[in-house]
Every structure is written in structure tokens, then in C-alpha cells.
Amino acid sequence: MTQILNKYIFGNAESPCIIKSADVLHAKTFEDYIIDKVKHYYGMTQNELKFRLGVDSNAKSLNEILLARMLDVKGRIACTEEFQKAGIIPKTIRVQSNGKIKESMSFPTFDFIALSKEETWEESELYNYLAPTKFMFVIFQERGAGAYVF
């Protein structure tokens, strides 16, 4: 529905695609395809990834930019047709060497009081958000002097 609104109502360009040919999905799932695309980069530092992927940025969203380039996407991967249809929300996480997460992640706000008053968990607003949603957590672990490794 979002794609229809963006394309025909708002006149926005088409969403970028990760999978260039539908034939790819005959052999593997979308999730397996994503893992196959990014596993070649496991163990690389942010600087190595920036060099290899041609990224010249130190933006706060650097990890998201690196992930998009790993998947051959220009722009946000959350806006790709495949991620939208699959209901997958990508989240990049930086974990410090002491095991603590560097930044907090944003999630929709919800009312704890209202949640506690729901008859069942399945009727809650939070459940209706979490149940159909998949999260793709991409971890960058700090190793050494501020170097984050994928």
C-alpha cells in the first residue's frame, strides 16, 4: 500500500530493490539471500568496509550506510520493496568492548498502564506491532581502540 501511495499519489520514485531477479528466491529464502550477501563482510572493521564499499562518510548513520552498500542499495534499506513487504525493520547496533550497547534504539511509544489492563497479550497494541514485525539486528562490536567490527 505504501508503494502505491508513494508512486501514484505522491509521485515519488520507485523503492530501491535488493533482489534484481525473482529467480533468486526459487533457490533460497529472502533471509538466506541477505545473509549470503553480507557474510562476506564478517570480521571487517568500519574503516575496512568504508574502503571496500567506497563509502566516504562519518555520519551517525554510517553503519546503516555500510549495510545498504553491502546489499547494493543506495538509500535506506528499510525503504526497499523487499523489506517493506516482508515487514522487516533493520536495526544497526554498536556494542562497546565492555558489552554495553552504545546508543539506544527507537521503538514506537506505548502506554505501560494500558498494556497492563489488556485482557490478553494478543489484544495489546504492543503485540499488534511486534507480532507481524521481524527485526534484522546488525551488530558492530568494538574491538581495540575504537574500531568497530561487523
Residue spans of the language-model regions?
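Nucleic-acid endonuclease domains
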Residues: 1-150
